[in-house]
Amino acid sequence: MIKELMHDPIFLAGKSEVATKEDLQFAQDLLDTLMAHRESCVGMAANMIGVRKRIIAFLDESGRAPTYTVMLNPEIIKKDGAYDTEEGCLSLLGGPRKCKRYKTIKVQYQTLEMQTRTKNFTGWTAQIIQHEVDHCNGILI
C-alpha cells in the first residue's frame, strides 16, 4: 500500500529498530511507495513512511538490469574510497546537501525470507544504500 511521506525532522532523526518477519508488510508498503515515486526517488527507508524499522528499498543498478531491492536490517560492514558529494531527499525540504560517501561498501542484511546475506556494492547503488542506512540510523543529510 502506498503511504504518505514523513517530513518531521524530529521523527526522522530517531534510530530505527530491528526489523522482524512480523514487519514484512511494512517492507511491501515501502516498496509500493518507492515505486509510486520512482520518477523522483531511487531509495527509501521505512522511517520515511512513518515506520521506525530497519528496512530499506532502492533501485539496484549493480546487476545486468536495474531491479528494486528490499533489505531488512542493513549494516555497512566495510567501506572504501571516501568522496564528497551532494544529495537530495524527499523527506527534507530544500535542495541538495553536502555529505561524505564511499565508492565501495560491503553490506550485511536480511532478505524478505529473513536469510542473512553479505554483498558488495559500488558506485551509484552504493551511494543510495549509504543514504538509506543513514536514515535507519537517524542521520539526515
Regions found by a protein language model. Name each.
Residues 1-141:
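Positively charged
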